[in-house]
A protein has these predicted regions:
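Aromatic- and acidic-residue-enriched segments that line the glycan-binding/catalytic groove
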Residues: 1, 26-33, 87-93, 220-230
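Acidic/aromatic-lined carbohydrate-recognition and catalytic surfaces
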Residues: 1-36, 40-82
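The substrate-binding groove and active-site-proximal loops of carbohydrate-active enzymes
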Residues: 1-3, 26-33, 47-56, 107, ...
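Generic alpha-helical structural signal
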Residues: 7, 36, 193, 246-247
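Conserved alpha/beta catalytic core and glycan-binding cleft of carbohydrate-active enzymes
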Residues: 47, 59-210, 214-215, 223-225
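Compositionally biased, low-complexity linear motifs
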Residues: 152-157, 221-241
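Acidic/Ser/Thr/Pro-rich low-complexity tail/linker regions in eukaryotic proteins
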Residues: 169-170, 232, 244
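Catalytic cores of secreted or luminal carbohydrate-active enzymes
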Residues: 240-248
Length: 248
């Protein structure tokens, strides 16, 4: 029974002090009451710990104030101004968007970055809601690929490399993809360490993509959701430099 297996999986995660946050996409024309009902169902029936919501018509104000969802972590790209102005705090509500990602990448990779904007991103925090900061997430390059590829390489997805974002602000440090050149590998290492330092020294909540701590690569694919193979899998094997990165 699929339902029973999923519930068992989530319970097992909880027993091991891990949480399950679902990424859910809703179409523009989706009924807002249906969205609320769906979130309540997953929160109460499956006991998921939160939701990363994607879509332009998500009723985020109603979700933030819903009694059934007050214990669920809610991640969304935009928080309405009226919530910012309320005296009530929303400790379960988090701003999740690409502002930090683009600001950090532009500055680190010398692609038109702004120290002023980076400073604002580093110190942004609010008593009403939280902020999530990241340089890589599940919808783009891995952290290792961010400094190994100037261009996306999504040919294996079967869409002639037209899928996935073209705005990556990535850098290959001198060679596209894998290399044995020591100076290129050292430059990539420095960039990666600086990226992690930026995220973890910021005041917001740091997010680290699974596998980035092991230098996982998707071979330059920045839209690998359809790759149920070595491209899309997280490689937990010992990579050169992995132990040094984790020690860092």
């Amino acid at each position: 029974n699929v339902t029973r297996e999923l519930k068992h999986l989530i319970d097992t995660l909880h027993q091991n002090q891990m949480e399950c946050v679902m990424e859910m996409y809703f179409e523009q024309e989706e009924n807002q009451n249906l969205i609320l009902d769906a979130l309540r169902y997953w929160a109460t029936e499956f006991r998921v710990d939160g939701f990363h919501l994607i879509g332009e018509n998500v009723p985020i104000t109603a979700i933030a104030q819903d009694l059934y969802l007050r214990r669920s972590k809610i991640f969304y790209q935009y928080i309405p101004e009226q919530l910012w102005k309320e005296k009530e705090h929303y400790p379960h509500l988090f701003v999740y968007n690409d502002e930090y990602l683009y600001t950090g990448r532009k500055l680190l990779n010398h692609q038109g970055g702004s120290l002023f904007e980076f400073g604002n991103q580093q110190k942004k925090q609010n008593k009403t809601v939280g902020f999530v900061n990241f340089m890589a997430n599940n919808n783009g390059f891995t952290l290792a690929d961010l400094f190994s590829y100037c261009e996306k390489h999504n040919e294996a997805n079967g869409e002639e490399n037209t899928d996935g974002s073209n705005y990556n602000f990535s850098i290959n440090c001198g060679t596209e993809g894998k290399t044995s050149r020591k100076y290129v590998k050292e430059l990539r290492r420095k960039h990666l360490y600086m990226a992690l330092s930026m995220v973890f020294f910021a005041q917001g909540v740091p997010l680290l993509l699974a596998g980035d701590e092991a230098l996982n690569s998707q071979q330059g694919n920045n839209n690998a959701y359809c790759q149920d193979n070595k491209i899309g899998w997280v490689n937990w094997k010992r990579n050169t430099g992995m132990e040094a990165l984790q020690e860092f």
